[in-house]
């Protein structure tokens, strides 16, 4: 339960998700619903509806919205290129904390408003935002609606999957000015594309277009046209959310932790997670749905 509404997050609540945010926001005299006495009525009303928007008194650079079991985190400073400063990094951390407290969520979509995802620049020191994103137990799908450079690319690397528009470019141009990545860029990039391509991008500071990014494994999908990005997102979302929530969590854990283990240790981790999964309701549902020739109805338990 939250003690107060988050200062830097706009919350679009569906059903009873983040009920603590309802109460906390109302206690701070939300512009949407003022009297705290209305809380039970509003919470009850929210059942089965599309959602109720709550706007804390202080809005900021990050938006958090919920749609059923998918949370969307949006960088919302398009006029500033969605640059990641300390304020935005703090807001991202708070959004990730809220997401981590909701066991009903199965996927996080991370994107930006405007024509870029997040670009390097500005006179203020960049904030560090990759750690809270990479620490999320559920899959994180990064939707690159435009360029991602410097700290913005480092943030994108903290996700599990990346899709982009065909016009997007990626790189670390700040290296030309002696600025070294400081939010995991030198570590996550080689783990994703391999040390050779990582050195290519880091040492030259050159920009990589969407086509090349796909070929080296920096992104997983490229929309054929900018307007088709939503369709690519919808397809991937359906595939991820339609599977076992526990299976997705364990797969993410096995890959993430396995990268830092020897092969034998990684195989032991994989075996252990399989043993745990075998005892879950989701595993039983998977077997039953196959035998009954129907689609599975996973509960995440």
Question: Predicted segment positions?
Answer:
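Conserved CoA-thioester-binding segment of acyl-CoA-metabolizing enzymes
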Residues: 6, 12, 18, 22, ...
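An acidic, glycine-rich surface segment that forms the CoA-thioester-binding/catalytic face
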Residues: 56-57, 89-93, 97-100, 107, ...
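C-terminal long alpha-helix characteristic of the crotonase
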Residues: 78, 163-168, 210, 219-268, ...
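CoA-thioester-processing core
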Residues: 133-135, 143, 149-202, 216, ...
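Acidic, divalent-metal-coordinating active-site segment for phosphoryl/phosphodiester hydrolysis
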Residues: 150, 205-212
């Amino acid at each position: 339960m939250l003690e107060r509404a988050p200062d830097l997050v706009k919350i679009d609540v569906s059903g009873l998700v983040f009920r603590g945010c309802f109460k906390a926001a109302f206690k701070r005299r939300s512009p949407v619903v003022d009297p705290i006495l209305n809380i039970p009525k509003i919470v009850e009303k929210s059942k089965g509806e599309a959602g109720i928007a709550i706007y804390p008194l202080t809005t900021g650079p990050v938006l958090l919205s919920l749609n059923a079991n998918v949370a969307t985190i949006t960088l919302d400073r398009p006029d500033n290129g969605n640059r990641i400063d300390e304020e935005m990094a703090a807001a991202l951390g708070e959004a990730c904390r809220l997401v981590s407290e909701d066991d009903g969520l199965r996927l996080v979509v991370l994107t930006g408003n405007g024509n870029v995802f997040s670009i390097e620049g500005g006179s203020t020191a960049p904030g560090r935002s990759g750690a809270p994103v990479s620490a999320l137990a559920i899959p994180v799908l990064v939707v690159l609606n435009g360029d991602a450079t410097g700290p913005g690319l480092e943030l994108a690397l903290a996700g599990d999957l990346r899709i982009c528009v065909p016009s997007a470019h990626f790189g670390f141009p700040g290296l030309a000015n002696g600025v070294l990545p400081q939010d995991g860029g030198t570590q996550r990039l080689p783990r994703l594309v391999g040390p050779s391509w990582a050195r290519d991008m880091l040492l030259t500071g050159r920009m990589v277009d969407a086509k090349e990014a796909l070929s080296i494994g920096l992104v997983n999908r490229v929309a054929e046209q900018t307007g088709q990005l939503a369709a690519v997102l919808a397809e991937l979302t359906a595939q991820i959310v339609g599977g076992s929530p526990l299976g997705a969590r364990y797969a993410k854990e096995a890959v993430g932790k396995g990268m830092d283990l020897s092969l034998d240790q990684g195989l032991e981790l994989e075996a252990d997670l399989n043993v745990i999964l075998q005892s879950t309701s989701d595993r039983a549902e998977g077997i039953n749905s196959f035998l009954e020739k129907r689609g599975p109805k996973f509960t995440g338990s």
